[in-house]
Amino acid sequence: MPDDYGTQIAEITAREILDSRGRPTVEAEVHLEDGSVGLAQVPSGASTGTFEAHELRDDDPSRYGGKGVQKAVENVSAIEDALIGLSALDQEGLDKAMIALDGTPNKKNLGANAILAVSLATAHAAATSLNLPLYRYLGGPLANVLPVPMMNVINGGAHADNNVDFQEFMIMPVGAPSFKEALRWGAEVFHALAKVLKDKGLATGVGDEGGFAPNLGSNKEALELLLTAIEAAGYKPGEQVALAMDVASSEFYKNGLYTCDGVSHEPAGMIGILADLVSQYPIVSIEDGLQEDDWSNWKTLTQQLGSTVQLVGDDLFVTNPDRLQSGIEQGVGNAVLIKLNQIGTLTETLRTIDLATRSGYRSVISHRSGETEDTTIADLAVATRAGQIKTGSLSRSERIAKYNRLLRIEAALGENALYAGAIGLGPKGR
């Protein structure tokens, strides 16, 4: 009997569902000959990098304001024809077949949303067929490291309807002994922050990723609020709970200038702003500190701050191994944000993570601002021993679903579970 007996793909179906913003996205099911079923849902970003794989939308103004994904759903039928009868255990072969079927560099024909939904659903089906949790199927026996969460508790930029320029102000429980405790610490700081905001007469409505979205006088004020909340919750800033930012600077870059807090800056001035913030606050990670194509200044930023703080490329690298390789060769950044839908297949995502690891770069597994109840990224973080995960704040169930999945994984691992903050895989507190 062949090793892949029963794991052949028998059927692939897809449907249009809604994400956390009420916009359509793609859900796929992969059915195997042995009756195993894998289900996956694809997220969608608000601030998207220019070089991301193509998210196929219908552009029909009569449905969902043109945001429908019926074309992508229909394209899954063509994918099914190409993959039927193949083994779900051959993830790389299946992903290559879909890439070849699409025939474009950015998956524009079939849509990265169609391809990724099938890619992930296939992995889930294969894991189910082997009676393994997804993290164990993908990561093998060494998949036992729980990531330090980057908790986006103050939202700005494209993720919120407020006047804050920087997109995310995050807390990282780097000093916690376990993921369970890290989650508790984060939740306590989140609720302390709510009280701090109320006491100051500031809004406590939340943005796309579940963080608060008050109007503030400056980006620095957001950091001050986080320090106040951390201390109010009984923790030590830096040592126990560190700070991180997603500047998302491409969103306020125009004609060679960065405009934040109402002032336009040359690239050197923007680097100076970030350096000042790092010197004044216990910041351990900065994402997209400069514009996605500003490679020369990214190199300068890395030379100035790379030994002090984690510099994460999101729009810069877009989970693309070719762009990451360019960054490695030029000495740009020291970490890569991993978003499955930026590249469009599980295989290419794993290749990017592997390249980062071999090159001394860290990987941060990430959600998108438009999410679903899918928890694949939680398993991916553990499978790859990435050590860090970005999956939003401590509210909105599409964010909490990932945290709760990590709690279940930690419980299943028992005494074999390691928390990245406790063993030094996450950014160090200072």
Curated annotation (Swiss-Prot):
(2R)-2-phosphoglycerate binds at residues 167, 339, 368-369, 390. The keyword Magnesium applies. GO terms for biological process: glycolytic process. InterPro entries: Enolase, Enolase-like_C_sf, Enolase-like_N, Enolase_C, Enolase_CS, Enolase_N. Mg(2+) 1 binds at residues 246, 287, 314. Its cofactor is Mg(2+). The active site is at 209 (proton donor), 339 (proton acceptor). Keywords: Cytoplasm, Glycolysis, Lyase, Magnesium, Metal-binding, Secreted. It is found in: Cytoplasm; Secreted; Cell surface. One of its GO terms (molecular function) is phosphopyruvate hydratase activity. Mg(2+) 2 binds at residue 46. The keyword Lyase applies. Binds a second Mg(2+) ion via substrate during catalysis. Catalyzes the reversible conversion of 2-phosphoglycerate (2-PG) into phosphoenolpyruvate (PEP). It is essential for the degradation of carbohydrates via glycolysis. PANTHER family: ENOLASE. Crystals are solved as a homooctamer, a tetramer of homodimers; in solution is primarily monomeric. Belongs to the enolase family. This is Enolase.
